[in-house]
Amino acid sequence: MSAFTPASEVLLRHSDDFEQSRILFAGDLQDDLPARFECAASRAYTQQFHHWQALSRQMGDNVRFSLVAQASDVADCDTLIYYWPKNKPEAQFQLMNILSLMPVGSDVFVVGENRSGVRSAEPMLADYAPLNKVDSARRCGLYHGRLEKQPQFSLESWWAEYNIDGLTIKTLPGVFSRDGLDVGSQLLLSTLTPHTKGKVLDVGCGAGVLSAALASHSPKVRLTLCDVSAPAVEASRATLAANGLEGEVFASNVFSEVKGRFDMIISNPPFHDGMQTSLDAAQTLIRGAVRHLNSGGELRIVANAFLPYPKILDETFGFHEVIAQTGRFKVYRTVMTRQAKK
């Protein structure tokens, strides 16, 4: 986090208005403005582990990562600055949660890129904090309102589920493939053979679909799942529990919290971080896998066919093979050998 996003640059045009404000920053926190903004007090709340990592270096205990905000996160705050994400259900979940805790009369600012659908904030908050557009620049909109009524928020009401091949998949807003199995994961699943053994790490686990499907056919497999998203971590735990499966699930920025080595690493890595295209996570995954695979261990990932992963795989492992493909997706496989760059 260094350069400011367009949304933050729009906020900075109004920085004088916030000098006396006690602000909670939330939503898609793509930069370190919450740590550098001149105001009376600044807190941040995020569902994204990598955003918490970056901000906690400067903000310490004034930034918190969790599935839901708590009363302590909004303590003494009189202003919410919410960065609109590209996922509307995620925005609704977070805003209903946070506004259920903010005191009536609080200032509510929503900022985001026009292409993210930030205009949806107006109808979404109409019953709680009617918004007016106060600025438009850098292809972003900035909206302001005052909290007139706290919404009701119950985490239980936000859970959803679907079924795949007899498995119950539990999910929450903001989790990848919330409404059903995506085509890429489906292709990767088709390559996993029954009776797989050993330790398997599922990076970017989402709702836990890949791990649950693998374990249902391979009861001797030992699962570890991780994701940057708090909703994904909770959804994966719930998916495993719903199907009577066991596994360790935790938040991690790719390998940041991962210990030890594995016999297989599987992933459908993201190539977007919020609204921005980013191959960072996938590059970190491929290059870091050599430090977390046993000798003879395998990395198996699915990706959009146009992404430049073959080059990174070859640079890191010395070779790769395509074991399944469609017009849009490819499943890549490579193995930990002596020629891999550790």
From Swiss-Prot:
The keyword S-adenosyl-L-methionine applies. It is found in: Cytoplasm. It comes from the Bacteria. The keyword rRNA processing applies. Its EC number is 2.1.1.172. InterPro entries: DNA_methylase_N6_adenine_CS, Mtase_sm_N, rRNA_ssu_MeTfrase_C, RsmC/RlmG, SAM-dependent_MTases_sf, Small_mtfrase_dom. It is an enzyme of class 2 (transferase). Keywords: Cytoplasm, Methyltransferase, rRNA processing, S-adenosyl-L-methionine, Transferase. Signal peptide: none annotated. Pfam families: MTS (PF05175), MTS_N (PF08468). CDD domains: AdoMet_MTases. Its main location: cytoplasm. Monomer. HAMAP family: 16SrRNA_methyltr_C. Specifically methylates the guanine in position 1207 of 16S rRNA in the 30S particle. Belongs to the methyltransferase superfamily. RsmC family. This is Ribosomal RNA small subunit methyltransferase C. It comes from Salmonella schwarzengrund (strain CVM19633). The gene is rsmC.
